[in-house]
Amino acid sequence: MALRLDGKQLAAELEQRLQAEIAAGLVQAGRPPGLAVVRIGDDPASGVYVANKQKACGRIGMASYLSHLPAKVPAAEVLATIQSLNLDERVDGILLQLPLPKGLDEGPLLAAIDPEKDADGLHTLNLGRLLKGEPGPRSCTPGGVMALLARHQIPLAGKRAVVIGRSILVGQPMALMLQAANATVSVAHSHTDDLASLTQQADVLVVAAGRARMIGSEHVKPGAVVVDVGIHRLPADPELGPQVKARLCGDVRAQEVEPLASALTPVPGGVGPMTVTMLLVNTVARWQQHCGLPFGLRDLLV
């Protein structure tokens, strides 16, 4: 039976740690850390994600600020909102909730965020810092994966790692973080020939393909650590009866892979909770540095 890499449990532990860091620095700083979220439009899923982030802020004693703009807002108004938050001394982290409505280009808007307040770690400067091994905000999902691997003392140095997916959001920074941990890293993508022959060599397999149930037992080396970044909602299956409603799944066919793997992240409850937690980590870290407080989160920003 594969070890369950429980992101929900680790996220709860890290929230307690962040709460303690905030409490320890509150008097000297004179204010709590603040996270500002810019939400555009009324996409229901985005609304749920934003609400979850605000609740997480509340649990650790972080202030949260929401700028909710209409779907047809001009790009200039979004830029003005971001610039205002860049100058706001209460704000340590800024998050532009994605995806954006049609007609808005996320590139210039993400670039407008102060790199020091880049809570998502997606600014070009911060991706460059990651590449060079310099300190700075880290991409949240890959950072969460690294924290999970570290929590379970999974060795990476000298291991063969394969990342499926090359997005700037997950795949590319994930590969850089694994490389920094001295793993030998390959990145697979939609043009990779004979994917299984590559993934069967992986001691650590990180799947961020964005395709439901894509990876099965034929892709996994016995004893491999498998990290499933994907999350998808499957429609209800009539053959399972009316009591079985829509289900969540990942990019991995977990029932097939679990008997082979030495460790596996569940979906839900694996990588997802850690993504939100790393957003908080980036924001608290900036607050500590900006307010001249002891920096107690260095181990989480690899």
Curated annotation (Swiss-Prot):
One of its GO terms (biological process) is L-histidine biosynthetic process. GO terms for cellular component: cytosol. It comes from the Bacteria. Pathway: One-carbon metabolism; tetrahydrofolate interconversion. SUPFAM superfamilies: Aminoacid dehydrogenase-like, N-terminal domain, NAD(P)-binding Rossmann-fold domains. Its EC number is 1.5.1.5, 3.5.4.9. The keyword NADP applies. Pfam families: THF_DHG_CYH (PF00763), THF_DHG_CYH_C (PF02882). It catalyses: (6R)-5,10-methylene-5,6,7,8-tetrahydrofolate + NADP(+) = (6R)-5,10-methenyltetrahydrofolate + NADPH; (6R)-5,10-methenyltetrahydrofolate + H2O = (6R)-10-formyltetrahydrofolate + H(+). Keywords: Amino-acid biosynthesis, Histidine biosynthesis, Hydrolase, Methionine biosynthesis, Multifunctional enzyme, NADP, One-carbon metabolism, Oxidoreductase, Purine biosynthesis. GO terms for molecular function: methenyltetrahydrofolate cyclohydrolase activity; methylenetetrahydrofolate dehydrogenase (NADP+) activity. NADP(+) binds at G165, R166, S167, S190, I231. The keyword Nucleotide-binding does not apply. Catalyzes the oxidation of 5,10-methylenetetrahydrofolate to 5,10-methenyltetrahydrofolate and then the hydrolysis of 5,10-methenyltetrahydrofolate to 10-formyltetrahydrofolate. Homodimer. Belongs to the tetrahydrofolate dehydrogenase/cyclohydrolase family. This is Bifunctional protein FolD.
